[in-house]
């Protein structure tokens, strides 16, 4: 796996699923391929994206700044600086300085990542802030190692939280989660269906599913009534893909 592929993988792992994630993935691909060279426009676009947490925006801004060639005097962006200040916690800043001193002696991506993984996400973000604000300088490879370690820490905590929700025995939470997933799947079906003649059927199934979820929420239904909703939708989506000549493995 190439360095940039690895960076893209880690960064995208902390972005919530949805149309925005696909858009960010495309921007990262363009930046890494040298196709997008207007850092100012890129940062302005990032600043106004909804849904993303300030820290995720800060990490993306840091990656864009590392990758896109820019004029030396280009102003640092406040939204990135604020996100990478470790919540203003002096302990984070102390640890960040110690980490920076170690990273300065490191020259490889994997070496930097290994060192950084023993620090908290707050200290890692503060260390990125030091480098972003030009208060410290490391090689691009080392900076990318720091980025990936930070993303791994964040993704780990997100995964723990997600797993807790998946294994919860609370029937109301499970019921709502199934309805949310069914609704999201229906939305994806509508986007994939496009404008072909066979699309009408897929669109109809997706539309009915969304109406059903709305009705279930409006009248309040038994928690077991949502079981299998998403699976039924995915079976319909696969049947549609087969007719279109698209052979894809099951979405799970």
UniProtKB/Swiss-Prot annotation:
Localization: Virion membrane; Host nucleus
Domain of life from the UniProt record: Viruses
GO cellular component: host cell nucleus; membrane; virion membrane
Motif stretch (Nuclear localization signal): 101-105
Bilayer disposition of the protein: Peripheral membrane protein
Span list, region RNP-binding: 165-252
Transit peptide keyword on record: no
UniProt protein name: Matrix protein 1
Gene field: M
